[in-house]
Amino acid sequence: MGSIYRSEHMKLCQIFFQSESAYQCVAELGELGMAQFIDLNEEQNAYTRKFVNEVRRCDEMERKINFVEDEITKDLVPIPDYDEHIPAPQPKHMGEMEANLEKLEEELVQINKNCKVLKNNHVQLLEMKAVLEHVTSLLDPHSKREAAMSISEAARGEAGPISFGMKDEFDKPVKDEKELKFVTGVVKRSKAIAFERFLWRLSRAKVFAKFIQIQEQTELFSNEFEDKCVFILFFSGEQLRAKVKKICDGFQAKCYTVPENPAERTKLLLNIKVQTTDMKAVIEKTLDYRSKCIHAAATNLRKWGIMLLKLKSIFHTLNMFSVDVTQKCLIAECWVPEADIGQVKNSLHMGTIHSGSTVPAILNEMETDKYPPTYFKLNKFTQGFQNIVDAYGIANYREVNPAPWTIISFPFLFAVMFGDAGHGIIMLIAASAFVIFEKKLISMKIKDEIFNTFFGGRYVVLLMGMFAIYTGFIYNDFYSKSVNIFGSSWVNPYNQTLLANMDAQGADSNTDLSLTFPPEIAFNHDYGPYPFGVDPVWNLAINRLNFLNPMKMKTSILLGISQMAFGIMLSLMNHIGNRSVVDIVFVFIPQCLFLGCIFVYLCLQVLMKWIFFYVKPAYIFGRLYPGSNCAPSLLIGLINMFMVKSRDASFAHDVGTAAGKEWVIVNGQNVTYTINDQCYLQQWYPNQSLVELILLLIAVVSVPVMLLVKPFYIRWRHSRGLHIDLGHGPDEHGEFNFGDIMVHQAIHTIEFVLGCVSHTASYLRLWALSLAHAQLSDVLWTMVLRMSLTMGGWGGSAAITILFYFIFSILSVCILILMEGLSAFLHAIRLHWVEFQSKFYGGTGIQFEPFCFTKIIRVYEGLDQ
């Protein structure tokens, strides 16, 4: 039985279906979602498979549903979600579904066609009505006289300074207004000017045009409309009429024939108005009927879509099965979690019953050397953390899963970099809202990708907020300020008189005087360590970074090496699971020795320095420690360890003798000594040089052991004909090649050795990002909020304070929570993917992707990818 620590045991199963029960059995397996089918017809193309015709019919129905959905979307009709369970339709119902969808499609197509014709006719009637209403004013005697004069002037060459060159057949003056011909119509207002200019130039000013804008909208049943103009064009001669008509067609201007007799125009206008009213009523009834069809279709669209989705996915799955020679039996192969084989058998039994078949489906477990897929049973809490791991790579089959450890380590390392209790509270509140209202938010089926990213990781953000509050109190950082909960271990050794004198001196010299708190008199040594976190007095100190930076830097190293060491420990679980003794003895143990002899030793030095080396003189490990100036330098000490550099055996010599040049009080006694040169670089515990030499030799010897022993051991087993587990992944071949094995082992050895150094340095980002966040928070507080709080006067100060607080809040959320939070999030991901998981995690497995209706429907609804 598997767990979240290791993937589930998988079984390759072979299932024999009767042809009449195969569809229903696959439908039941789709509802269960615990079987990943293997395509047994990979060599066949999609057009030669057994159920290709059914798939094509499903594709055609899908096209019709998409067409209906497009029509619904055009009308801005909401499509309600269908939350009730919909069983997979029976194959015998496909004909009914096809008929219903075909009828609906034909009906909508015919309605759209009729609507288009009716709307065009209605537009033409409205345009004709507008022409008839305005043409009377355009055909008055004054307009005709003006047109005749303009055309005659153009014919005589008096139209203006432009020379048209040679004369043509149109260059005849108009002798009588009765010779004038005219064309009326409608053109878009945006084209009117170009239309008029083109007519003027092409006819050489022999066409006189007048325009009147239509005030009434001519496209009542369209969301898109343009302003239009009624035009009338005066000219003489039938040849020019043909040319004018072509120009009108080119500018998409519609021409309408208008009687010259006013009485006939009036009669025609009345007739047009009646037709317009009738046409409008017909269109409204047609659109009303279309709206009813659209609303009825919208109600059932999601239901039809889900039914078709299940139908099509079942036939796609059936196409993956092989057919026996009798054509009466289908054979399938699938991966099934071993713990769920009973449920799969029960689903097959239910499918057989529902299909009415008398022959049950038979499931056989197969022995195979195929690489199984990886499957973890997850819940809504663990899913987010597993997604972080899977984004790097899917775990190998039965490999140790990093996700359980990531649940704690990921938000904690994020919080070490984020480290602000105030911002952590905001993050916690936001994540809590997602968790509290998660059922309501899930039911809303929000498809926004950014929202779903945050909502899917709501429990990750929740723990990130909790740990940010915890580390914020450890750093005693609340919006860049400290909180005085337990008081302070430091006391002010200066009296009021001295402080007043120092203020006066500072004012006289126009300088800021700083006070120094000597630990001997200003620190309460009897108080002991601060109960929790950092003493709040450090927030007031000028040298607070000199104190906080080394603390955070060393803490980062401790956390980093601890996590890397834990990763190596997890690799032991993989070796035990693989029953690989050679990996345990000649890979795991040398890795532990290499990491321990150098980096764990460094961590022990950090802890010992914190515990033993204080500001007061003392005897430490039998050696006189004169004071903080002799506190050992760990970095240079580590370098000296690799260089095997000789060092003095203690911090001082001539201790307790008359030759001592200096003295200190240790345990109430005066002790004389002579301090050694660069005392902070000398040995600080007995036989330190010997111990470090031994550790260095062990670390150096571990490297060739990691590099050489395993490849030659595998070669020895191969030469003896013994079984060799090459540990190949799903995409690799199992042929023995000593050169490949040697190169592979060399890469892993070099990666581990160099990685121990580079990864340790990489963990310093925990300190760097914490410092950056603290400094940004301090700048924001100083430059925005404190500025408003220190403003004098009462007039408008409250409004200014509110304004600055609003700005402070917006910048805090946008910069310090979102931007800095995203930065810390990405760095935490890097530390887990590279520094932690590289010690034990392969990440080259195959994701278990069962045939599951729930997953398919979520992808169809746009909720999953």
Curated annotation (Swiss-Prot):
Residue spans, topological domain Cytoplasmic: 1-409, 475-556, 605-623, 710-798
UniProt keyword DNA-binding present: no
BP GO annotations: nematode larval development; vacuolar acidification
GO MF annotations, alphabetized: ATPase binding; proton-transporting ATPase activity, rotational mechanism
Glycosylation sites: N578, N670, N687
GO cellular component, one term: vacuolar proton-transporting V-type ATPase complex
Main location: membrane
Keywords of the record: Cell membrane, Coiled coil, Glycoprotein, Hydrogen ion transport, Ion transport, Membrane, Transmembrane, Transmembrane helix, Transport
Coiled coil stretches, renumbered: 51-121
Phenotype when the gene is knocked out: RNAi-mediated knockdown causes larval lethality at the L1 stage. RNAi-mediated knockdown at the L1 larval stage causes reduced growth rate. The progeny of the few that reach adulthood is arrested at the L1 larval stage. Rhythmic defecation behavior is altered; the defecation cycle period is extended and animals have a slight arrhythmia. In the intestinal epithelium, pH oscillates once per cycle as in the wild-type, but the oscillations are diminished in amplitude and cells are relatively acidic. Also, luminal pH oscillations are reduced.
Transmembrane segments: 410-430, 454-474, 557-577, 584-604, 624-644, 689-709, 799-819
Topology class, membrane: Multi-pass membrane protein
Topology feature Extracellular, residues: 431-453, 578-583, 645-688, 820-865
Superkingdom, natural source: Eukaryota
Places the protein is found: Apical cell membrane
Stated family: Belongs to the V-ATPase 116 kDa subunit family.
Annotated PANTHER family: V-TYPE PROTON ATPASE 116 KDA SUBUNIT A 3, VACUOLAR PROTON ATPASES
Functional note: Subunit of the V0 complex of vacuolar(H+)-ATPase (V-ATPase), a multisubunit enzyme composed of a peripheral complex (V1) that hydrolyzes ATP and a membrane integral complex (V0) that translocates protons. V-ATPase is responsible for acidifying and maintaining the pH of intracellular compartments and in some cell types, is targeted to the plasma membrane, where it is responsible for acidifying the extracellular environment. In the intestine, required for the rhythmic defecation behavior by promoting acidification in the gut lumen following defecation.
Quaternary organization: V-ATPase is a heteromultimeric enzyme made up of two complexes: the ATP-hydrolytic V1 complex and the proton translocation V0 complex. The V1 complex consists of three catalytic AB heterodimers that form a heterohexamer, three peripheral stalks each consisting of EG heterodimers, one central rotor including subunits D and F, and the regulatory subunits C and H. The proton translocation complex V0 consists of the proton transport subunit a, a ring of proteolipid subunits c9c'', rotary subunit d, subunits e and f, and the accessory subunits vah-19/Ac45 and vah-20/PRR.
Name the record gives this protein: V-type proton ATPase 116 kDa subunit a 3
Naturally occurring in which organism (per UniProt): Caenorhabditis elegans
Gene field: vha-6
